[in-house]
Design a protein with these regions (language model features):
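Extracytoplasmic/periplasmic copper-protein system
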Residues: 160-172
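Periplasmic c-type cytochrome electron-transfer domains
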Residues: 2-74, 78, 137-153, 169-172
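N-terminal start-of-chain detector that recognizes signal peptides
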Residues: 38, 58-60, 81-86, 106-109
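Short, flexible segments with low predicted structural confidence
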Residues: 47-48, 97-98, 120-121
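Extracytoplasmic electron-transfer domains, predominantly the class I c-type cytochrome c fold
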Residues: 102-158
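Short glycine- and Lys/Arg-enriched binding-loop motifs that mark or flank ligand-binding interfaces
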Residues: 72, 89-93, 125
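Periplasmic/extracellular electron-transfer cofactor-ligation site
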Residues: 77-104, 131-137, 156-162
Length: 172
């Protein structure tokens, strides 16, 4: 029985020492925060998991109507272009802006991730941004316009380059 108490004490001591060492690693500058290097896999996983859990918890808005409305999707394409989303995320027939290549983590390819996101999550990310990723907050933009962007992003994989070009022409 005595050995169980000693084993628990040893486990507790290892946990305390490990926590102090881990905190020291981050707090005293040993962890490299340079954007020129990718994070270690475990850090990238932890950050992505934290990001997704936070977005899922805070994203409570519901679309004001159908996001399948063609007029809403077209308006979203125009807003997507005018607000500069295309610079980091690209668009049908349009590559990322050269300057966005230095962002870490890389801006997501929306065609690939949209199937794994709910509209409420996309809305929250556009409205609030994501800290330490380069994704700015667009909270100053009217919610209706943000929903049009969400509608467009939901269809981005099916929009042709010609459609995007026609839809993203600024209105006079």
């Amino acid at each position: 029985m005595r050995w169980k108490g000693r084993l628990l004490a040893l486990i507790g001591l290892i946990a305390i020492v490990g926590s102090i060492a881990g905190a020291g690693y981050f707090l005293f500058g040993f962890y490299n925060v340079a954007a020129s290097q990718a994070e270690p896999d475990v850090v990238a996983w932890a950050l992505a998991r934290t990001r997704m859990a936070s977005v899922d918890r805070h994203a409570t808005e519901r679309p004001p109507g159908s996001l399948d409305d063609p007029a809403m999707v077209r308006a979203g394409a125009r807003a997507y272009a005018e607000r500069g989303c295309v610079n980091c995320h690209g668009a049908p027939g349009v590559g990322w802006g050269k300057w966005s290549e230095g962002l870490r983590p890389d801006p997501p390819d929306l065609k690939k991730i949209v199937k794994d996101r709910e509209p409420r999550q996309l809305f929250w990310v556009v409205k609030n941004g994501i800290g330490m990723t380069g994704m700015p907050a667009f909270g100053y933009v009217d919610d209706k316009e943000i929903w049009t962007i969400v509608a467009f992003v939901g269809k981005i994989a099916t929009v042709s380059p010609e459609e995007f070009k026609a839809w993203s022409v600024p209105t006079q």
